Amino acid sequence: LLKNDRQLLPLSIGKLKSIAVIGPNADQIQFGDYTWTRDSRFGVTPLQGIRKWAGTNVKVNYAKGCSLVSMDESGIRQAVEAAEQSDVCVLFCGSASAALARDYKSSTCGEGFDLNDLTLTGAQPALIKAVQATGKPVILVLITGKPFAIPWEKKNIPAILVQWYAGEQSGNSIADILFGKVSPSGRLTFSFPESTGHLPVFYNHLRSDRGFYKSPGSYDSPGRDYVFSAPVPLWSFGHGLTYTTFEYSNLQTDRTSYLLNDTVHVRIDLKNTGKREGKEVVQ
């Protein structure tokens, strides 16, 4: 869980009358690289998982909107209509490892497939902006095997999740998270860059002779790292939110100083101070 403004997530199934499920990965199963032993006919898509939760009480309005690679925007109108008819919208975008997905014939991620840009491919950015423009609450779920440079989405979309390639039960697992049966607890194992030009992106930049410059510049006063942006990631290594809160206390180490190859043993007291069950990756 990368972002969750105003606690939009988890969704309360009892308060919803309708939900829009939109995007090129909404009715798709992404098995991920080196999983060709799975039969692509099996598995649960996000759309199927959400419909299972919705039952007969919540209307599910589905629209693909666009494909992962084509610039064709003709399906966006249908996606906007689905959003306008719904209480909340869940967008499933991202990438594909084609041979290991259900239907796709083109890869945008995986071994042997490199892109020269880290923005979302095809008409996906246009789809996201069109759905956001309806004014309905929007949740963006990235089903992908890599990070994306999505500064506009970070600024304008209230809730963002990354599911990666979750396998044949991906639809059930993401529905459980969206509706609060399970609290997300994952942490990023790499950073999300601001743009393709921000690579490499990491937190521990070496200090230069000019010091640290973490603020974006302007046309009148250019910055000294990246001229018009700061050299910090959208989300850093280790970032990850959940639906509850935790309190760290009584930090103890087994000694006061360490040599280079020593093992550091640390003990803490960890308390769930929120109202939901949850897991915490201590860091």
Regions found by a protein language model. Name each.
Residues 1-283:
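C-terminal non-catalytic regions of proteins with extracellular/luminal or membrane-system context
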